[in-house]
Structures are given as C-alpha cells and as structure tokens.
Amino acid sequence: MNERICVYTCITGDYDNLHEIVKEDGIEYLCFTNNPKIKSSYWKMVYIEDEDNLGNMLLSRKIKILGHPYLEQYDISIWVDGALEVKGKLRQFVKEWCDLSRYPMACFCHRLRNCVYDEARACIVHRKADKEDVIKYLNFLEQEEFPKEYGLAECTVLIRKENDLEVKRTMKLWFELLCKYVKRDQLSFPYSIWKTGLKIHWINLNVFDNPWFFWKAHKQKEETKSARIFFDEYKDVYNDIYLDGSIESEDNKEIIRFLIPKECSEISVNVGKHFGKIITSVDVSSTIKALDVFPGMDVPPYTVADYDDMVFYIKGHFCEGQKLIIYYEIHDFSEVDMQEIGEKLV
C-alpha cells in the first residue's frame, strides 16, 4: 500500500485543544487553523483565512467537507474531529477496514441510530440544533421522498479518495445543504450520498473507542444555564411539547422551576454537559414514583457526569398546570471525591 496519506483536522478560534498523536512514518498530519496561537510539534500547521465570512463553525465545516487545495497532493485523506485523539497505525486501519479498492469513501456507522429522521429528533432533545431549522430540513427531505433508515454516519472521521470526482461532487452538495438548512452535518450527509449515488463503505466500529481513535471531548467554555424539559417520550418533532427553562443558583444549589403543560407520567430534564463534575443530590418539590440520572457513573450519593448531556428522568403522575421545582447540587470533581468513589467501587 503505497498511497500518499494525510490525516487532517481543523481548529478555528479556540473551540478545541490540539491533541498529541501517535505518528506513523509516511503519513503527514495537518492542522488547518485561523488561530496563530496554536502550535504543535506533532502537526504541520496550515493557516487559513475566513474569506467568505462564514464564522468559525462553518469555516471548520468547510475544511472538513470540501477540503483544501493543499490536500490534492494526497491519494487518501483522513479527516479527524478536533476532539479525537489519533493513537494507532492508520495504514493498517485503511487497509483492513476501509476497502478503498472498491469504494471511494469510508465512514463509521452511527453507534446509536440508523435514520436521519430519528437523528433530527435527537438533535432537538440534546439541543444540537434549533427546532425551526430542523423542521425546514425535514420538510425538504419529505418533499424529496428521502427514505427512512437509509443509514447514518458518525462524521467525526471521514476517509476519502481525495481526488475522486464523485466524492468532490457529493461533498459540494453536502456543504451547500449544511449552509442552507440545519448546521448539523450528520443530518445532511445521508441525503447527499443518496442524491449523488456515491457508494460508501460502512465501518462497523465505535468511532469513539477503537484501536485507532479515542474521544477526548470538546472544550466546555461555560456551564449550561438552561434546561430542556420533555413530557413523556418526545416522538413527534412537529407537535410534541417541550420547554426551555432557566437554571438558577441559590444557596449552593441549582434550581429549575416550570409549569407542566400537559398531563403526563414521565418528565425528562436535560441540563446539558458537565464533564468532570459530580452531582451529589437531586430533589423534586412534588411526590414522585422514581428519579434516575443518566448518563454517568452512578455511585450513591454521587453521579459523575461524563461526555454526554446529563438528564434527570422523573416518573409520577403529573397534571396540566402543576408547578414543579427541581433542586440539585453539582460541583467540581475533587481528589477527596475520587478517593471516596474509588472506595465504593472496590
């Protein structure tokens, strides 16, 4: 396998840290950035300008999807999200898992879903996109008669034959859709490959945990100060109700107050990402049947927040117009906490 291979990423503004890598001879590692403060002895820096005034997020997506003239000297490009750490031999990975002799592009299968319509709902639940933008895009897909369960990619890693014309045509459509509709590239990728007919080799591995890539999480600049609240299971993007409520701080506790808009038996409260924090208590103002906290490592009386959004699941009988107050304590993970939790796990 003598193809010229590059691994590349893009960090705009100060959204991510540039991770160290396990370098492999014969592969070049490129970081495109508009931040001159970012330096690395592992990555070759390629400085870029925002000539189209896209803003940091779309500029990074542009490099991710459309690439850059610098990449045209390579046969194969491997895009890696700025939150991923490259840790394994990538020539072996390309040879064993990507099948580029038969396909011009390879992607990891989404680890949870296989359908754009389900992913659109998840984007609202996890506050990845505005509902109005999602609905506009879903209307477009329905007009195009785009099928359900067509497939869904984890777009954190993309392996492409860099100069393949069908790949370039598909990437152009992908970026156009991203700019026109919702700014979540996972939503517009399946339609793009369906529309152009680009054949993809699907990699059936967890992109976040495998011998070649490891998830390190994006930088969290500030704490989430609002909660997204759902009543019973959120299935219908068009009609089901949710609320966005503020998170207030009083007496070392976080407090969420809201009126329940309909009779229901379960309320889920998404309080956002709090990686490295611990929640030591959660209380509700009304009588309930059960309360669960997910995800995280549950070691009573601690719940350790991980990379995903923290969600409180509250079960009971709730009436329309009923006032509910949620109190919880959250703070930084200390060495004392680590020791106490370690003792409970032994």
Where is each model-derived feature located?
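N-terminal anchoring/stem segment of glycosyltransferases
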Residues: 1-61, 70-73, 182-183, 195-197, ...
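A conserved donor-nucleotide-binding helix/loop in the catalytic core
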Residues: 53-78, 88, 92, 188-189, ...
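The conserved acidic donor/metal-binding loop of glycosyltransferases
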Residues: 81-85
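Extracellular carbohydrate recognition and processing domains
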Residues: 237-262, 294-311
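Short beta-strand-plus-loop segments that form exposed binding edges in beta-rich domains
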Residues: 269-276, 330
